[in-house]
Amino acid sequence: MMKLLFFDIDGTLAYPQQEPPVSAVEAIRQARYNGHMAFLSTGRTIDSIPEAVSRIGFDGGIFSAGGQVAMGEKVLFRFHMADSLLQELLVWLRSMPVFYALETADGRFHSENAEEVLRLADLSGISESAMKLTQEILFDPGMRPMSEYGGQPVFKIAYHCPKGAERARLSAALEGLVKLVDYDNLLELPISVGEISDPEVNKGNAIRALCRHLGMTTADCIAFGDSMNDLEMFRTAGVGVAMGNASDAVKALADLVCDRCECDGIAKALKQLDLI
């Protein structure tokens, strides 16, 4: 019986700045050959998928952590943050040393305070590679300045702020208002990197929408992930598979815990589930 397979990218298919292991690439291709459908399910925007990931070959994907759902090159659904919530968030974000980017169908629009955030970050003991990645994140040429933002609906907000007190202040200000996820366990950087989203815009609801479109049930879905923005996906899918490098909270909700992503975890899990 055909299954719908959903794969997070960072920390699941590969670590940031790294390519997926050959075992994962071959296993996903074999699963598709065996009649299953494979989808990305990532916090990344459609325009920021690494080429090495795209080359694997997928039937579609969930992007911006549930903001967009696509089959092939066609976007089927878009789920936006409530405008009232967005306006409230912008008031908070503008009052803090937080660099942020609004993710929309027309691109990512960033605040213009990257230099301030970098100046406030503790750079002591930071490696050259970590500093390079920090600058690539804050000064990504793929983003557009906030002055060009025209009020387009927003899927979610990517944020970057100094670690420590400022990150704690951000969390306290937004607690109970939004879903706040960070990727500090994946990225050893002087800044905290994460996303702010409407609790109703998530990977789980996106999977439900895709299942309705395909005439499938969520029981036919198998989801692979490692981070807190994968929890709704695990609650929705018939089977949730946590990577060995996932946090304890993610592992606790999973039906299966496989090996780490760099230790052939995806290939081993697909074999264990009799999909390849």
Residue ranges of each PLM-predicted region?
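Short hydrophobic/aromatic-enriched beta-strand-loop microsegments
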Residues: 58-66, 180-182, 242-244, 258-260
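Mg2+-dependent phosphoryl-transfer enzymes with acidic/Ser/Thr/Gly-rich catalytic loops
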Residues: 1-4, 21, 193-276
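Active-site phosphate-binding/coordination module
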Residues: 16-126
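Short, structured coil segments at secondary-structure junctions
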Residues: 56-57, 65, 173-177, 236-237, ...
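Residue-level signal for inorganic ion chemistry
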Residues: 31, 42, 65, 157, ...
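Conserved acidic, metal-coordinating active-site core of Asp-based
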Residues: 107-222
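Active-site glycine-centered loops adjacent to acidic/histidine catalytic or metal-binding residues
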Residues: 8, 42, 226
